[in-house]
Amino acid sequence: MEASLAIYYGIILITVTLGLVYTWRVLNWIWLKPKRLEKLLREQGCNGNSYRLVLGDLKDSYKMGKKAKSKPMELSDDIIPRVIPYIQQLVQIYGKNPFIWSGTTPRLILTEPELIKDVLNRTSELQKPKYEIFKFLFSGLIIHEGEKWRKHRRLMNAAFQLEKLKIMAPSFLTSCIDMISKWESTLSSDGSGEIDIWPSLQNLTSDVISRNAFGSSYEEGKRIFDLQREQGELVMKNLVKSLIPLWRFIPTATQRRMHEIEKDIDSSLRYIINKREKAMKAGEATENDLLGLLLESNHQEIRDHGNNKNMGMSLEDVVGECKLFYLAGQESTSTMLVWTMILLSRYPDWQERAREEVLQIFGNKKPDYEGLNKLKILPMILYEVLRLYPPAFGVTRYVGKDIKFGNMEVPAGVEVFLPIILLQHNNELWGDDAKMFNPERFAEGISKATNGRFIYFPFGGGPRVCMGQNFSLLEAKMAVSMILQNFYFELSPTYAHTPNLVMTIQPEKGAHVILRKVKA
């Protein structure tokens, strides 16, 4: 009897203890920790809204963003009030380094160039934030830390060296020729016509990355990237919801579809990778695509360490990097291209200057790698497009342990956000024409335009700078050169200016342009 009572009271004690521990953790998570971090940030002179239970600023930010996007904006490149209105408001109210509440986590917004440079250069002391929902979309180099990141960066670097890009240039050309032919087929007998170029440019960049990621497995690669595009749309539609506690455990139709896509993509990539591995083991020549170069680099790493497979990437690692090829290779380049065409439509003098240079170098011949590197006007235009419409609107890092930036002490548990677009549109940093299209500012290069300050980083910066930026810029130069050779273009009266922040800044209502064939 006494033994039974002892067991009974023991169970009650354990249950009560576990209940108290769980209650404490929940209380700390939803209230005590956020309020403690808020107090510490305010002591550093940083200000923002007071913490609100669980959701923080999410609800207000969502409502303001929805209102800002409720109708097209005027034809202007001052897009910040439309794409990040809430962050803009916080900076206006609270000064240069305010904080915003991403649910229960305070996110410190840094807008001072020296602090931003410090953050981006301290890779080993800061982490990439881990949002569960993004696991559906990508893994690989972008989320790795420490030694694993260093190893993957080293192995992938072989695929993005300039001599490798030179080999890939003809496949860029093939994809561009296909797109130009499709555009020509839509023109009327007088050589003019209206099209929405946005879907075409998305297909172009998807085509390019499919050819250059998977080579002979191009068709299967294209199907995978179509699935990735659908997954990206689902992720962004549910991003705010995913920050609500326990959201991922709710069995919705969207959740089921995201899991289905993830499973399909992973199994398809495994099939392609295993097929390529078998071909390489059989002595077949390595294909000069990103997958082939990555696998060859991986095999070399294993051989250099006495055939120790633990020193290379696992199959799961390679799958993750292949997913990343899409995100890096498709999203950023397609948006760069669409905004380039929109801006050149609005500024015909720059369109003509770029066309004259392209025709001077190539005439009616197809662009090649050597000729693209001789262009001066077009790179200036692309740099300015990336300044006004950067692929990523900001960079986020997680503070895992207390750290100091300049004179500012930032406590562990805070996220640091670097708003690329705010810096690149800042009148104090770029002059009174900061929100206007003026490629002339890059006439003597990026360093001269920025006066050596860290105020321009469309592809990120520091050790984690995007390693695919040369791939993206080469593709953009090839595509725009061919478009200029073949078409004059201007905005259609039906064009609605609707910059929209999805994964990147995209034209929500498309990009309707009138094309006119250039006479041979």
UniProtKB/Swiss-Prot annotation:
It is found in: Membrane. Keywords: Heme, Iron, Membrane, Metal-binding, Monooxygenase, Oxidoreductase, Transmembrane, Transmembrane helix. It is a single-pass membrane protein. PROSITE patterns: CYTOCHROME_P450. GO terms for cellular component: membrane. It comes from Medicago truncatula. GO terms for biological process: saponin biosynthetic process. It holds the Pfam family p450. The keyword Secreted does not apply. This is Cytochrome P450 716A67. PANTHER family: CYTOCHROME P450 72A11-RELATED, CYTOCHROME P450 FAMILY MEMBER. Its cofactor is heme. Heme binds at C466. Belongs to the cytochrome P450 family. The lineage of its organism: Eukaryota, Viridiplantae, Streptophyta, Embryophyta, Tracheophyta. GO terms for molecular function: heme binding; iron ion binding; monooxygenase activity; oxidoreductase activity, acting on paired donors, with incorporation or reduction of molecular oxygen, NAD(P)H as one donor, and incorporation of one atom of oxygen. Its EC number is 1.14.13.-. SUPFAM superfamilies: Cytochrome P450. The keyword Lipid metabolism does not apply. The chain crosses the membrane at residues 4-24.
